């Protein structure tokens, strides 16, 4: 049974616009999984979620589920502009890790306090239900989910998702693969085990190899690191994601070409794509 994966936002850190980024797009992270018999499942609530809401229109969203990887701005800043939440009859459950210094619900609510936003969280027509997840596996309607703690400042989860008839899918945003932050070699081994056998991996490719030494510990990876990880995991498809806001379309094309050259040497069967706003894949 086909599962449709749609990319609504693929930039990291801050949304961008203009002719230099028109093909890749400039919205921050938001993806959806759609499958017959399963509720709409959303991954992250960056500014891309606004376009998702516009596609739903004035209809309420019933039984929707939103997985938050972490609460940095670029992954939650679109939530106030998700129009279904302003329509009666919408039901949305938000699931994500507990941040280090507050509850998940309080962080989502605080970004809509009066000092920074005109309308409070409580005034959504149908305020979402918020549930905190641990790193233990759990089930959502339609999917089995295995979280994994990523190498990124704060508490950040990647999600491996499976369902009958769908190749295992892994969403690995905001993740530093090289040395940095506070994780060890055993963490990297665990990441490889967690990804093993995943058919499609969406992975952070924020930085270029040339600029990485100055950004160690910031919690992001390069396309070449992502290719090597996907090759080691035996993946069929790698989607490069979380593009640097300073990277124009031509630079994204060059990054992709270099990544494909590396993949041809490391894992000839690995398909490498670069995410762009509006990309649709089938799992």
Can you say where each PLM-predicted feature lies in the sequence?
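Cap/insert and terminal regions of metallo-dependent hydrolase folds
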Residues: 168, 176-271, 276
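Conserved SAM/AdoMet-binding glycine-rich loop
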Residues: 173
